[in-house]
Regions:
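Tryptophan-centric aromatic hotspots in well-structured domains and transmembrane helices
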Residues: 1-4, 34-35, 68, 86-87, ...
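Conserved alpha-helix/loop element of class I SAM-dependent methyltransferases that forms part
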Residues: 1-15
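Class I SAM-dependent methyltransferase SAM/SAH-binding core
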Residues: 16-20, 24-67
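Conserved Class I S-adenosyl-L-methionine
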Residues: 24-26, 144-235
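A short acidic, Gly/Pro-enriched loop at the edge of an enzyme's catalytic core
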Residues: 66-77
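A short beta-strand submotif of the Rossmann-like class I SAM-dependent methyltransferase core
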Residues: 80-81, 89
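A short, conserved alpha-helix within the catalytic core of class I
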Residues: 87-95
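Conserved catalytic/acceptor-binding region of the Class I
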Residues: 94-164
Length: 235
């Protein structure tokens, strides 16, 4: 996935990429082999401290997508992994446009469970009643501000499917990381986690769970007609 993203964003030595909402650097560290200069923007000091220790090659700055702390035309590319749906798009899109150079590209990345996988579908069936809302990356409502914006053209898209082996307890921990589940009273949370564990069965052997990574690459509209159609392909 990262190799295809790097090609789509034309990341290489001599280019600069700004990683927004960088968190602890999960995507940031994967960009290092491209040879590009990496500027990681993260508002939380605790997250930045982890990022700086994990990815010393990156320049970590305090900031947000709505107030990016770099000059105009700094970046050849801007990335955001698992983050764009949290941005205030009305403010973030002009900022991203501002920091991109002519020809610059915006790469948005999301990981999600592959619901074509029967195991993942069963997990979703169990947890969906407990969600008060669905993340925008699942409903795709994050697309609307970009569709309406004159600042970026239609995206090029690709998806990559991958597997991760999880034990019963690792699966339960993964589900517990969902804020809506973690916030449940213990009397409701514990039985749910027991049902989640039962998806795998009684054994301790890890089971493969399928995931997918969806990538969307947008080009600055001043360099690409806004009515140009993007492409979509899967890997």
């Amino acid at each position: 996935m990262v190799e295809r993203l790097a090609r789509a964003l034309d990341l290489r030595a001599g280019t600069t990429v700004v990683d927004l909402g960088a968190g602890t650097g999960k995507l940031t560290r994967l960009l290092v082999p491209t040879g590009a200069r990496i500027v990681a923007v993260e508002p939380l000091a605790e997250m930045r401290a982890v990022l700086e220790a994990a990815v010393p090659e990156a320049e970590a700055l305090e900031g947000t997508a709505e107030a990016i702390p770099v000059p105009d035309g700094t970046a050849d590319a801007v990335t955001a992994a698992q983050a764009f749906h949290w941005f205030d798009a009305a403010r973030a899109l002009p900022e991203i446009h501002r920091v991109l150079r002519p020809g610059g590209r915006l790469g948005l990345v999301w990981n999600s469970r592959d619901l074509d996988d029967p195991l993942q579908a069963r997990v979703e069936e169990l947890i969906s009643p407990y969600r008060e809302w669905y993340p925008q990356q699942m409903t795709q409502s994050w697309r609307e501000p970009l569709r309406a914006s004159p600042l970026f053209g239609a995206p090029d898209e690709f998806s990559v499917r991958w597997e991760q082996e999880l034990t019963r307890d690792e699966l339960a921990e993964r589900v517990l990381s969902i804020s809506a589940i973690a916030a449940l009273p213990s009397a409701r949370r514990a039985p749910l986690l027991d049902r989640i564990r039962s998806v795998i069965g009684d054994g301790r052997k890890p089971f493969p769970f399928r995931y997918r990574t969806d990538v969307f690459v947008f080009t600055r509209s001043s360099d690409r007609p806004s009515n140009e159609r993007g492409t979509s392909f899967q890997g």
